[in-house]
Amino acid sequence: MDRKYDFKSIEAKWQAYWENKQLFKVEEDPEKPKYYNLEMFPYPSGHLHMGHVRNYAIGDVVARFKSMNGFNVLHPMGWDAFGLPAENAAIKNAIHPATWTYSNIENMKRQLKTMGISYDWDRELATCKPDYYKFTQWMFLKLYENKLAYKKKSAVNWCPSCQTVLANEQVVDGACERCEAVIEKKQLEQWFFKITDYAQRLLDDLALLPGWPEKVKTMQKNWIGRSEGCEFSLHIEDSDEVLTVFTTRPDTVFGVTYMVLAPEHPLVEKICHPEQEKEVKAFVNKMKYLNEMARTSTEAEKEGVFTGAYAINPMDGSRIPIWIANYVLMDYGTGAIMAVPAHDQRDFEFARKYDIPVKVVIKGEDTPLDGNLLQESYPGDGHMVNSGNFDGLTVEEGQKAVIKFMEEKGIGQGTVNYRLRDWLISRQRYWGAPIPIVYCPECGPVAVPEEELPLYLPEDIDFKPYAESPLKHLERFYKTTCPSCGKEALRETDTMDTFVCSSWYFDRFCSPHESKQPFSREAVDYWMPVDQYIGGVEHAILHLMYARFFTKFLFDINVLSCQEPFTRLLTQGMVLKDNAKMSKSKGNVVSPEEIIDTYGADTARLFILFASPPERDLEWSEQGVEGAFRFLNRVWRLVSELAEGIKDLPAAEHFPELDSEAKNLRFKTHATIKKVTEDIGERFNFNTAISAIMELSNTLGAYKGIKKPNWPVVKEAVDNLLILLSPFSPHICEELWQLTGHAESIYLQKWPKYDPEALLQEEIEIVLQISGKVRDRIMVPVDAGREELEKIALDNPKIRELTRGKEIVKLIVVPGKLVNVVAK
């Protein structure tokens, strides 16, 4: 049968078929095991890039595989649709953010459909729609009700380019994660979520996630940053003020020779002596314009100013000078440290620069007792010295003894500190979920009642590059009445960080049309947690941490039954071109639309899944795409040619009296079933699964040429070849499945199970090569040894003919695989 592989009409045909038949639509079914498969939903930028294609192709293989294995598969898609780019586009192009966003969604949805992804589009959601952000606001109210949402004045990260506040996690190397502008510090009233209340649970429960990459768990562990130590107070000389510090090394408290406050510390102004005031103010001012990275980098020069004030060491009564310095930050610990230059390198460098004494209190093997003789700090183990009654104790013993002494004397207490800070969620922008709070002169901050949600984001608004939220300029939005007393009041004009919207969207997918509550309890109890989550490692801290926090909170208020949102996590690598991440600025972007138009979605999917294991970076290769296209063309020709011989045959259950060639084809078929099943189901080794399918195709192609093929064996091989290939390249497999006499969609077929009997071999096929080029394929006894294989190869008619008159230099034998005759 001579039919051309017309991928365009084939792909359009089957995409329409799937949609019309609603093949991917699912409901809860207690009779079937569920499988919730989710790729991180995208920001609707308007165009898919190759990273999207890879992410969604990986997810689709898993979804199709699980469905064919009898699971009730939930595979939804939606849009993380609030955010700054829409607002910037509005200002730049005089177009409303909603118009820009919905237009982008339509285009990206069309592109996704051309990829043939098995999404249940009935569950589509967009976080910018009122029926969604109504419940984002509900989440805020619940957090507020439970004392986990609060407002305070804080030194915040301000992006002068985006004109908004950023969370700590959105600042990378002192710059805005999105636009790379250097951030500034500003004092602003901001809303926070108290994620720190969950720090220990977020840390402990990483142990419940064996299906997560260790790298991601380590990143979260480091971000939470648990440290054990003690917190104690020091009185300030000639003042009623008290200074509180946290230290992980209470054993070194006798070695404190100066204290350091962060320049932003509220005590700086109160304790500064008049003669130091000018210098201190100048230094504080200078620090306002330095980002955290520049201040705390190990390469950064340590700078500071003496305040003129002294603290009293509660352990020995010594006077300790109080400095301010660039390397101490207000938002870590208490914003104050005890400096022990003999045993901390940063303190040591600072002390040497400003001629501050260095006192040794931990003696290692070669540590001099005289601090003046130290060339660098000694942070290691040893025994306490110069420490009064604690002399002679080991570091570990000393830490316990000092904490015990402090607790008995009421000086301090053992405590745990975390690097994790509360989540700053206020954004001074328009295109986000409005914060449902009203400020009343009589009642103070008042929550908008639940029955009044959603608090709508006004659509008709003037877009200008304001230095504050545009909502502040819209009287009909911010002027309101107090829900409590009815008097005139003002609305909060900040909107929520978009990460709030994405911290619970996976719950909403379980029942996206629910109008009275965020999700149906019955639905989330059936579907949650997500069984497989797929997305980039760049979300390891931000999104994944926030999603875990929300899930634990929703469990605590008894609306969810699970405490972790994602059972397994796959972080796929990037798609590179010329060894660099694809980007417009580098001019190395490959358009998925062009690739699909030229080669088809099946080819694009096959290449991107074959070129590299999913967790590794993938180098784009035009030759690789062409190779995938050639393979699909070969499959098309092969199955088309075999179709007439098998389309009217029933599937055989028994295969008696097979000759060696038929046995070998059955062996290859069932070995491939076993390999592909394990590679997809256990390891996500899609590249090796595809390689095995290619080998089966080659074996089938070779078998096709024999005089009297066993058609039931051929049918079994063809049917399984198509089923195994269908999660990777579904359109061509649907078409060939139909062509070979099947009425029902290949998607509805059961995944095959291998026959152990077929894997018991008397003979196996090996390749015969001459100088690395394949010249023949032959059947040999399964237990043939090296010498026997050498003899078989040299006696082979093709090998003898092609090596006549040549010198055979050596024979390379790989038992069970090949014999390579090297001749010259």
Curated annotation (Swiss-Prot):
The keyword Chloroplast does not apply. InterPro entries: aa-tRNA-synth_I_CS, aa-tRNA-synth_Ia, Leu-tRNA-ligase, Leu_tRNA-synth_edit, M/V/L/I-tRNA-synth_anticd-bd, Methionyl/Leucyl_tRNA_Synth, Rossmann-like_a/b/a_fold, tRNAsynth_Ia_anticodon-bd. GO terms for biological process: leucyl-tRNA aminoacylation. ATP binds at K584. GO terms for cellular component: cytosol. Gene3D superfamilies: 3.10.20.590, HUPs (3.40.50.620), Isoleucyl-tRNA Synthetase, Domain 1 (1.10.730.10). CDD domains: Anticodon_Ia_Leu_BEm (cd07958), LeuRS_core (cd00812). GO terms for molecular function: aminoacyl-tRNA deacylase activity; ATP binding; leucine-tRNA ligase activity. A motif ('HIGH' region) lies at residues 42-52. It comes from the Bacteria. Coiled coil: none annotated. It catalyses: tRNA(Leu) + L-leucine + ATP = L-leucyl-tRNA(Leu) + AMP + diphosphate. Keywords: Aminoacyl-tRNA synthetase, ATP-binding, Cytoplasm, Ligase, Nucleotide-binding, Protein biosynthesis. Its main location: cytoplasm. Its EC number is 6.1.1.4. It is found in: Cytoplasm. A motif ('KMSKS' region) lies at residues 581-585. Belongs to the class-I aminoacyl-tRNA synthetase family. HAMAP family: Leu_tRNA_synth_B. This is Leucine--tRNA ligase. It comes from Syntrophomonas wolfei subsp. wolfei (strain DSM 2245B / Goettingen). The lineage of its organism: Bacteria, Bacillati, Bacillota, Clostridia, Eubacteriales. The gene is leuS.
